[in-house]
Amino acid sequence: VTETMPIRLKVNGEAVSALVEPRQHLADFLRLHLQLTGTHVGCEHGVCGACTVRMNGDIVRGCLTLAVQADGAEIETIEGLSESGEIADIQAAFHRRNALQCGFCTPGMLVTTSELLACIDRVPTREEVRSYLSGNYCRCTGYQAIVDAIVEVAVARRSGSDT
Protein backbone atom coordinates (compact mmCIF):
# COMPACT_ATOMS: atom_id res chain seq x y z
CA VAL A 1 0.00 0.00 0.00
CA THR A 2 1.46 3.31 -1.08
CA GLU A 3 1.12 6.15 1.38
CA THR A 4 -0.53 9.29 0.04
CA MET A 5 0.16 12.89 0.92
CA PRO A 6 -2.27 15.81 0.96
CA ILE A 7 -1.61 18.76 -1.32
CA ARG A 8 -3.39 22.06 -1.80
CA LEU A 9 -2.73 24.24 -4.76
CA LYS A 10 -4.38 26.51 -7.29
CA VAL A 11 -4.70 25.23 -10.81
CA ASN A 12 -5.82 27.76 -13.39
CA GLY A 13 -7.19 29.91 -10.59
CA GLU A 14 -9.20 27.13 -8.95
CA ALA A 15 -8.38 25.82 -5.48
CA VAL A 16 -7.57 22.10 -5.54
CA SER A 17 -7.03 19.69 -2.66
CA ALA A 18 -5.99 16.11 -3.29
CA LEU A 19 -4.22 13.09 -1.91
CA VAL A 20 -1.30 12.06 -4.11
CA GLU A 21 1.39 9.44 -4.06
CA PRO A 22 4.73 11.02 -3.11
CA ARG A 23 6.36 10.04 -6.42
CA GLN A 24 3.53 11.14 -8.72
CA HIS A 25 4.65 13.73 -11.23
CA LEU A 26 2.79 16.99 -11.63
CA ALA A 27 1.98 16.22 -15.27
CA ASP A 28 0.35 12.92 -14.29
CA PHE A 29 -1.54 14.62 -11.46
CA LEU A 30 -2.91 17.23 -13.87
CA ARG A 31 -3.86 14.63 -16.45
CA LEU A 32 -5.21 11.86 -14.20
CA HIS A 33 -6.71 13.73 -11.25
CA LEU A 34 -7.89 16.92 -12.94
CA GLN A 35 -8.40 15.67 -16.52
CA LEU A 36 -6.26 18.53 -17.83
CA THR A 37 -4.90 16.52 -20.73
CA GLY A 38 -3.32 19.42 -22.62
CA THR A 39 -0.16 18.86 -20.59
CA HIS A 40 1.48 16.08 -22.56
CA VAL A 41 4.05 13.56 -21.37
CA GLY A 42 6.63 12.69 -23.99
CA CYS A 43 10.14 11.85 -22.90
CA GLU A 44 9.63 11.72 -19.12
CA HIS A 45 13.15 13.17 -18.77
CA GLY A 46 12.43 16.90 -19.07
CA VAL A 47 14.03 17.34 -22.46
CA CYS A 48 11.10 17.47 -24.92
CA GLY A 49 9.07 20.29 -23.33
CA ALA A 50 5.66 18.71 -24.00
CA CYS A 51 4.84 18.78 -20.27
CA THR A 52 5.65 22.48 -19.76
CA VAL A 53 3.40 24.32 -17.29
CA ARG A 54 3.76 27.44 -15.17
CA MET A 55 4.34 27.09 -11.45
CA ASN A 56 4.23 30.35 -9.51
CA GLY A 57 4.81 32.22 -12.76
CA ASP A 58 7.85 30.24 -13.92
CA ILE A 59 7.81 27.47 -16.49
CA VAL A 60 8.64 24.00 -15.21
CA ARG A 61 8.64 20.51 -16.64
CA GLY A 62 5.64 18.64 -15.28
CA CYS A 63 7.39 15.30 -15.81
CA LEU A 64 10.25 16.32 -13.50
CA THR A 65 8.23 18.16 -10.88
CA LEU A 66 6.51 16.05 -8.26
CA ALA A 67 2.92 16.88 -7.42
CA VAL A 68 3.93 17.25 -3.76
CA GLN A 69 6.40 19.96 -4.81
CA ALA A 70 3.43 21.95 -6.09
CA ASP A 71 1.81 22.03 -2.65
CA GLY A 72 0.88 25.67 -2.02
CA ALA A 73 1.75 26.68 -5.58
CA GLU A 74 -0.21 28.31 -8.36
CA ILE A 75 -0.17 26.20 -11.51
CA GLU A 76 -1.20 27.40 -14.95
CA THR A 77 -1.72 24.86 -17.70
CA ILE A 78 -2.34 25.28 -21.39
CA GLU A 79 -6.07 25.04 -20.66
CA GLY A 80 -5.92 27.96 -18.24
CA LEU A 81 -3.80 30.11 -20.53
CA SER A 82 -6.12 29.35 -23.42
CA GLU A 83 -9.36 29.98 -21.51
CA SER A 84 -8.03 33.28 -20.11
CA GLY A 85 -7.30 34.54 -23.62
CA GLU A 86 -3.70 35.29 -22.64
CA ILE A 87 -2.32 33.27 -25.54
CA ALA A 88 -5.11 33.79 -28.08
CA ASP A 89 -2.87 35.78 -30.41
CA ILE A 90 -0.14 33.15 -30.20
CA GLN A 91 -2.62 30.35 -30.92
CA ALA A 92 -4.03 32.28 -33.88
CA ALA A 93 -0.55 32.89 -35.30
CA PHE A 94 0.39 29.22 -34.90
CA HIS A 95 -2.77 28.31 -36.82
CA ARG A 96 -2.26 30.96 -39.50
CA ARG A 97 1.38 29.99 -40.05
CA ASN A 98 0.74 26.23 -39.95
CA ALA A 99 3.08 26.03 -36.96
CA LEU A 100 1.50 22.81 -35.77
CA GLN A 101 0.91 19.49 -37.35
CA CYS A 102 0.32 16.58 -35.01
CA GLY A 103 -0.10 19.03 -32.11
CA PHE A 104 1.71 16.98 -29.48
CA CYS A 105 4.37 19.62 -28.82
CA THR A 106 2.04 22.59 -29.26
CA PRO A 107 0.88 23.08 -25.64
CA GLY A 108 4.47 23.18 -24.40
CA MET A 109 5.49 25.46 -27.27
CA LEU A 110 2.65 27.86 -26.45
CA VAL A 111 3.46 27.98 -22.73
CA THR A 112 7.15 28.57 -23.47
CA THR A 113 6.33 31.20 -26.09
CA SER A 114 4.09 33.06 -23.66
CA GLU A 115 7.00 33.27 -21.21
CA LEU A 116 9.42 34.42 -23.90
CA LEU A 117 7.12 37.21 -25.06
CA ALA A 118 6.39 38.27 -21.48
CA CYS A 119 10.03 38.53 -20.42
CA ILE A 120 11.49 40.38 -23.39
CA ASP A 121 10.70 44.03 -24.04
CA ARG A 122 11.43 44.01 -27.74
CA VAL A 123 10.93 41.83 -30.77
CA PRO A 124 13.27 38.86 -30.34
CA THR A 125 15.54 37.84 -33.17
CA ARG A 126 14.85 34.55 -34.90
CA GLU A 127 17.97 33.12 -33.26
CA GLU A 128 16.75 34.21 -29.82
CA VAL A 129 13.40 32.53 -30.45
CA ARG A 130 15.14 29.33 -31.53
CA SER A 131 17.39 29.44 -28.48
CA TYR A 132 14.46 30.01 -26.12
CA LEU A 133 12.58 27.09 -27.67
CA SER A 134 15.61 24.80 -27.53
CA GLY A 135 13.99 22.79 -24.73
CA ASN A 136 10.85 22.15 -26.76
CA TYR A 137 11.06 19.49 -29.45
CA CYS A 138 8.88 19.27 -32.54
CA ARG A 139 9.22 16.30 -34.84
CA CYS A 140 6.84 17.60 -37.51
CA THR A 141 7.31 21.23 -38.49
CA GLY A 142 11.02 21.92 -38.75
CA TYR A 143 10.50 24.97 -36.50
CA GLN A 144 10.46 27.54 -39.35
CA ALA A 145 6.70 28.12 -39.10
CA ILE A 146 6.86 28.14 -35.29
CA VAL A 147 9.53 30.86 -35.31
CA ASP A 148 7.57 32.78 -37.97
CA ALA A 149 4.45 32.71 -35.79
CA ILE A 150 6.28 33.86 -32.67
CA VAL A 151 8.04 36.73 -34.44
CA GLU A 152 4.70 37.75 -35.99
CA VAL A 153 3.07 37.95 -32.54
CA ALA A 154 6.03 39.83 -31.06
CA VAL A 155 5.90 42.41 -33.85
CA ALA A 156 2.13 42.78 -33.50
CA ARG A 157 2.33 43.17 -29.72
CA ARG A 158 5.05 45.82 -30.02
CA SER A 159 3.02 47.76 -32.57
CA GLY A 160 -0.18 47.36 -30.56
CA SER A 161 -2.06 45.66 -33.39
CA ASP A 162 -4.05 42.46 -33.31
CA THR A 163 -2.59 39.46 -35.09
PLM features: residue spans?
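Signature of N-terminal electron-transfer/Fe-S-associated modules in redox systems
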Residues: 1-163
